[in-house]
C-alpha cells in the first residue's frame, strides 16, 4: 500500500514539473514569419499575383468580346450550344445563373487580395535585409499597386459600385460597396503615385529581364483608359487628362515604343 502511495506521489511530481512550453516548430507550413529569407523569396511573392492576372483575363475576354459586335460564337449543329450561354452573351440576354460575370468578379477580387497580402508583407520588410536598394524595392511594391489598380479598373468597368479592399486587415476596407466615384479616385491616385516609383522602359526593343512587368508607360496607359471612360463611369469629362498621358507615351516620356 505504501508503495502505491509513493507511486502516486511520484507521478504527481512528474506531472507538475512537466514542460509547459508548448510552442511548436512547424515544418509543413510556410507563414509570413518564416517565408521571406532571401531576395528571391521577396521577388517570388511579388510576382505570384501576376500569374493569377494572366489566368483571369480569360473571363474578361469572353464578357468583352462575345457581348460586342466583334466576336460571335454560333451553334454548329449540336456543337457550341452549351445551353445557349454563348448566344445569351451575344444577344445580351444573360441571366444571374450564367457564370461568366461571377468568374470575372471572383477573378478580379482574388487578384486584389493577392496584391493586398503582398503589399502588407512588403510594408513590414526592410529592403536592405534582402539586398534591395530602396528604388528596387519601391518599384516592386508599385508594381503590385498598379496590378491591383488594373483589377479595380476591370471591376469599375464591369460592375461600377463594388467593395474596396486595400489590406488583409478588414478594418481598413469598406464595409460594403463604394460609389463609382470613390473607386475611380482610388484608381487614379494609385496610378499617379506609382508613376513616380515604377521603372522606365529601356531601349526600343523588348524590356530585357523586366519584360512583362509593370512600368511607367503601363501605369500611364491605365490612366488613359480610366480618363477615356470617365464620362461613362462617373459622369465627368476627363478627355484633356486622357490626351495628356496618351501624348506623353507617344512622345517617349515613359520609354521608347
Predicted regions and their residues:
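Conserved, well-structured interaction surfaces
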Residues: 43-47, 51-56, 79-159, 174-182, ...
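Membrane-proximal, proline-rich intrinsically disordered regions
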Residues: 19-68, 246
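Extended, well-ordered alpha-helical segments in internal regulatory regions
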Residues: 151-163, 223-234
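Bacterial Sec-dependent N-terminal signal peptides
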Residues: 1-28
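Tetratricopeptide repeat
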Residues: 187-194, 242, 249
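Short, well-structured active-site flanking segments
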Residues: 25, 156-167, 239-240
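TPR/Sel1-like alpha-solenoid repeat signature
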Residues: 145, 220-223
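Short, surface-exposed recognition loops and adjoining beta-strand edges that mediate ligand/DNA contacts
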Residues: 33, 60-79, 168, 199-218, ...
Amino acid at each position: 500500500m505504501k508503495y502505491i502511495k509513493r507511486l502516486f506521489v511520484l507521478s504527481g511530481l512528474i506531472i507538475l514539473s512537466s514542460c509547459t512550453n508548448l510552442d511548436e516548430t512547424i515544418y509543413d507550413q510556410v507563414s509570413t514569419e518564416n517565408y521571406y529569407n532571401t531576395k528571391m523569396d521577396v521577388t517570388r511573392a511579388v510576382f505570384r499575383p501576376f500569374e493569377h492576372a494572366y489566368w483571369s483575363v480569360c473571363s474578361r475576354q469572353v464578357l468583352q468580346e462575345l457581348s460586342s459586335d466583334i466576336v460571335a460564337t454560333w451553334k454548329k449543329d449540336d456543337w457550341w450550344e452549351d445551353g445557349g450561354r454563348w448566344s445569351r452573351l451575344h444577344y445580351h440576354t444573360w441571366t444571374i445563373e450564367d457564370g461568366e460575370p461571377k468568374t470575372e468578379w471572383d477573378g478580379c477580387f482574388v487578384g486584389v487580395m493577392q496584391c493586398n497580402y503582398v503589399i502588407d508583407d512588403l510594408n513590414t520588410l526592410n529592403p536592405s535585409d534582402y539586398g534591395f536598394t530602396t528604388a528596387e524595392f519601391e518599384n516592386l511594391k508599385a508594381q503590385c499597386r498598379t496590378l491591383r489598380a488594373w483589377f479595380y479598373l476591370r471591376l469599375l468597368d464591369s460592375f461600377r459600385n463594388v467593395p474596396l479592399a486595400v489590406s488583409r486587415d478588414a478594418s481598413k476596407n469598406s464595409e460594403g460597396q463604394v460609389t463609382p466615384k470613390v473607386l475611380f479616385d482610388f484608381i487614379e491616385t494609385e496610378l499617379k503615385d506609382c508613376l513616380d516609383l515604377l521603372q522606365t522602359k529601356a531601349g526600343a526593343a523588348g524590356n530585357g529581364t523586366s519584360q512583362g512587368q509593370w512600368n511607367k508607360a503601363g501605369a500611364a496607359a491605365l490612366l488613359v483608359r480610366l480618363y477615356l471612360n470617365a464620362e461613362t463611369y462617373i459622369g465627368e469629362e476627363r478627355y484633356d487628362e486622357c490626351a495628356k498621358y496618351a501624348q506623353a507615351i507617344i512622345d517617349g516620356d515613359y520609354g521608347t515604343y
